[in-house]
């Protein structure tokens, strides 16, 4: 492979689409805390002065949708009407109904192990050894930049920052190996009284330099900090937000394929979410075991059917064993039926709100990031 560039982007927790994702997952967590067997599909729409929460839920739990919504918005940092969006004054509309009984009869089984998939679909999981968290570097560092923006905003280091922000990082590769960072874009909402010069200096010294490894930066690296020159109007005032619109930010930054299904607001019976987590778990363990430098796994399902309709693996020429052997090892060591993968990763619990900003993958706080199968995989592969 010749020299090439690859770019990924991320957005902060205050981005309108991420506000929506976090509200949807906060509602999901509140329900799962009371009823781990609940069926939840929660969608959120945010715009100036209002939040609409809708979807389908089947549960014995009762949760206060309005209070959950306000608390989530408050924690993100929209606490002042000057921003055009305020946790205490925004309208909260609740349009949640019940899940279709036609879906229930396809999913629920007398034997839990035979629980059918909640929908048809295809999901991908990916891992690469180019970072210590076995994730692609572009998305990893794009997340780190907006996470740092949030930290210095909240701890008072840069009190004039506002919650909405976006990052983009372009890495240069030679023969598949990182040789540097070609370009960095960071746009952050700010208070009106901050000059462009002060903002550029503060972002460079307080956000970019502490996050990006110095050995990847050079005299040719290009920096674009608030390139429009002004970012005062942001959040839901600037753009409406909707659950599930940042699926590439949520996963691998475009480095791997995506089946199209969003994650936030969905309980683990929805394989869009749970099987994508399981696929990441499988791919990460294959790479951690040294069976490949890069691994992408696809799994697919039919609604109401427990067994996956297909499993396939791509190692991009980096595999130490054949892909047929890898698939056999996957079937031997991992449970990919909906009930089994939920149990394998302990997914029927309130862990989802923290996934809804800064990436679902590459953070060791989540069970699908464990590499506890790597040793057994390596042994059974004969390496």
Swiss-Prot record:
Reaction(s) catalysed by this chain's protein: L-methionine + ATP + H2O = S-adenosyl-L-methionine + phosphate + diphosphate
Residues that, per the record, bind L-methionine: 56, 99, 239, 270
PROSITE patterns: ADOMET_SYNTHASE_1, ADOMET_SYNTHASE_2
Pathway participation: Amino-acid biosynthesis; S-adenosyl-L-methionine biosynthesis; S-adenosyl-L-methionine from L-methionine: step 1/1
GO CC terms of this entry: cytoplasm
Free-text comment on the cofactor: Binds 2 divalent ions per subunit. Binds 1 potassium ion per subunit.
SS bonds (residue pairs): none
CDD domains noted in UniProt: S-AdoMet_synt (cd18079)
Family: Belongs to the AdoMet synthase family.
Function: Catalyzes the formation of S-adenosylmethionine (AdoMet) from methionine and ATP. The overall synthetic reaction is composed of two sequential steps, AdoMet formation and the subsequent tripolyphosphate hydrolysis which occurs prior to release of AdoMet from the enzyme.
Protein name, as recorded: S-adenosylmethionine synthase
Gene giving rise to this polypeptide: metK
């Amino acid at each position: 492979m010749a020299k090439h560039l690859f770019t990924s982007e991320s957005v902060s927790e205050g981005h309108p689409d991420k506000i929506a994702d976090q509200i949807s997952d906060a509602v999901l967590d509140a329900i799962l805390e009371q009823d781990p067997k609940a069926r939840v599909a929660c969608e959120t729409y945010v715009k100036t002065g209002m939040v609409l929460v809708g979807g389908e839920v089947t549960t014995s739990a009762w949760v206060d949708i309005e209070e959950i919504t306000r608390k989530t918005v408050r924690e993100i940092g929209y606490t002042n009407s000057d921003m055009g969006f305020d946790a205490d004054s925004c309208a909260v509309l609740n349009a949640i109904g019940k899940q279709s009984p036609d879906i229930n009869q396809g999913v629920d089984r007398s034997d839990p192990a035979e629980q059918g998939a909640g929908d048809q679909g295809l999901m991908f999981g990916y891992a690469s050894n180019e970072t210590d968290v076995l994730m692609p570097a572009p998305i990893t560092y794009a997340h780190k930049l907006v996470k740092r923006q949030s930290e210095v905003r909240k701890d008072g280091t840069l009190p004039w920052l506002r919650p909405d922000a976006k990052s983009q990082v372009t890495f240069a590769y030679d023969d598949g190996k990182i040789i540097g960072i070609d370009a960095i874009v960071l746009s952050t909402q700010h208070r009106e009284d901050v000059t462009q010069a002060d903002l550029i200096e503060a972002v460079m010294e307080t956000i970019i330099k502490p996050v990006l490894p110095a050995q990847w930066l050079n005299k040719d690296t290009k920096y674009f900090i608030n390139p429009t020159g002004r970012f005062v109007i942001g959040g839901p005032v600037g753009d409406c937000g909707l659950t599930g619109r940042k699926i590439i930010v949520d996963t691998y930054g475009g480095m791997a394929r995506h089946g199209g299904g969003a994650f936030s607001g969905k309980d683990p019976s929805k394989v869009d979410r749970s099987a994508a987590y399981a696929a990441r778990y499988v791919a990460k363990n294959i790479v951690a075991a040294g069976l490949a430098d890069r691994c992408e796994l696809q799994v697919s399902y039919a609604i109401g059917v427990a067994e996956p309709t297909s499993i396939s693996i791509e190692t991009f020429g980096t595999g130490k064993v054949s892909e047929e052997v890898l698939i056999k090892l996957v079937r031997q060591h991992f449970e990919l039926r909906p009930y089994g993968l939920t149990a394998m990763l302990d997914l029927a619990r309130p862990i989802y709100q923290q996934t809804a900003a800064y990436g679902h993958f590459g953070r060791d706080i989540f069970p699908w990031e464990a590499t506890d199968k790597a040793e057994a995989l390596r042994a059974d592969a004969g390496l």
